[in-house]
């Protein structure tokens, strides 16, 4: 189920403040965040956000196509090792 339109999108307040401050100053600094559930707003476009995947921070460069998605979608938490198969001799 998606979030109610009445509530609006969830954007982490601290993350939004940091991005807006960078937009005003014109600096491009990588911002670390643990807020994987935070939605990407149009203000984030052009910035790099380091999203925590449970082990380390994955740098995510935000483009226009990512607006409306959540930050956690672009930082996978699991590594796929491959299915079991026949060992080649």
Curated annotation (Swiss-Prot):
Record's function text: Protein S19 forms a complex with S13 that binds strongly to the 16S ribosomal RNA.
Pfam families xref list: Ribosomal_S19
Coiled-coil residue windows: none
Organism annotation: Phocaeicola vulgatus (strain ATCC 8482 / DSM 1447 / JCM 5826 / CCUG 4940 / NBRC 14291 / NCTC 11154)
GO biological process, any: ribosomal small subunit assembly
Keyword terms, alphabetized: Ribonucleoprotein, Ribosomal protein, RNA-binding, rRNA-binding
Protein name (database record): Small ribosomal subunit protein uS19
Family: Belongs to the universal ribosomal protein uS19 family.
Keyword Ribonucleoprotein: yes
NCBIfam families recorded: rpsS_bact
Single GO term (MF): rRNA binding
Keyword rRNA-binding: yes
């Amino acid at each position: 189920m998606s979030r109610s339109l009445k509530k609006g999108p969830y954007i982490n307040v601290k993350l939004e403040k940091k991005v807006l401050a960078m937009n005003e100053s014109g600096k491009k600094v990588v911002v670390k965040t643990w807020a994987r559930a935070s939605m990407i707003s149009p203000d984030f476009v052009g910035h790099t956000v380091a999203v925590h995947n449970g082990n380390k921070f994955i740098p995510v460069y935000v483009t226009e196509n990512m607006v409306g998605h959540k930050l956690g979608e672009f930082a996978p938490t699991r590594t796929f090792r491959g299915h079991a198969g026949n060992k080649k001799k």
